[in-house]
A protein has these predicted regions:
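N-terminal active-site beta-alpha-beta segment that forms phosphate/nucleotide-binding
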Residues: 6, 10, 19, 28-31, ...
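Conserved phosphate- and dinucleotide-binding cores of soluble alpha/beta proteins
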Residues: 2, 7-14, 20, 25-31, ...
Length: 274
């Protein structure tokens, strides 16, 4: 049980299913392994510092949990590391037949792919924005064993009139209402950078990104662009957006934000303030 849990990153329920024992029995086995010395923990000095930073962030921004991961050894691995950590955090806290809200972006895509290998029980996923079908675990959906409720709309409509009409559609508004039923909400935090998913995917142009930055935008959540205090920036993009409103996101329980990198520091700080 200890090997599966600590080295193969399996959840307690997955271990119970693999060994044909109860989850409570797995918990007792893991506890016995720790007390007997089979499993020993050593905290690196940098890990102690990260734990202290986590506590400080929790106190400052009134957060339930904060997990800071070590810096990735190789360039380009940071999003993958954040995604894996986010998936492990959620997997260990999901109940049977759980429901998860999912946001938009590259980190969310990676997180869902990792979650697909960690969760054995059926999971319901609800999209918080339009235009999400391309990054859900398409090829691994059988492994993920998920029931998907996707917002049947693009992320950005061609006009604010079209966006208003789409938001009024029952098939879209019902998905937005369903979000309140979820156990967890996973969202990415986007930076105002040319490599942001929303720019690379062609949703907005470089010129639109520049105008948003000139208007005071420092980042986005669910493609809602916010200023340094986490307040919404009015824009043509916002008028054409098909996405769960920020006020509804703030009202949800267990919202998990996933973000990493120096270029996202300002955006992360703004979202925490908002």
């Amino acid at each position: 049980a200890a090997w599966y849990y600590y080295f193969e990153n399996m959840t307690q329920q997955a271990i119970a299913d693999r060994l044909s024992i109860s989850r409570m029995r797995v918990i007792k086995l893991l506890d016995a392994a720790r007390q007997s010395g089979v499993i020993q923990f050593r905290l690196r000095s940098d890990s102690v510092g990260m734990m202290q930073q986590s506590r400080e962030l929790m106190q400052k921004y009134h957060l339930n949990d904060v997990f800071i991961i070590p810096e990735a050894e190789q360039e380009g691995q940071l999003n993958e590391s954040i995604a894996r950590a986010g998936a492990m955090y959620v997997a260990d806290r999901l109940s049977e037949n759980a429901c998860i809200n999912v946001g938009y972006g590259d980190t969310l895509s990676r997180t869902l792919n990792h979650l697909a290998t960690m969760v054995q029980n059926p999971v319901t996923c609800i999209s918080l924005t339009g235009g999400v079908s391309y990054y859900l675990p398409n090829g691994r959906s059988n492994i993920f064993n998920a029931r998907l409720y996707l917002m049947p709309a693009p992320l950005l409509a061609s006009s604010h009139e079209m966006a208003a009409a789409m938001r009024a559609e029952a098939s879209v508004s019902e998905i937005i209402r369903m979000a309140a039923l979820s156990s967890f909400t996973l969202v990415g935090i986007g930076a105002m950078h040319e490599t942001a998913t929303i720019v690379r995917s062609g949703i907005i142009t470089q010129n639109e990104l520049f105008r948003l930055k000139m208007s005071g935008a420092v980042g986005d959540v669910l493609c809602h662009f916010v200023d340094e205090n986490g307040e919404l920036i009015p824009s043509d993009i916002e008028d054409r957006l098909i996405s769960t409103p920020l006020e509804k996101l703030r009202a949800l329980d267990n919202v998990v934000g996933l973000a990493a990198g120096a270029q996202k520091v300002e955006a992360i700080r703004a979202v925490l303030r908002g």
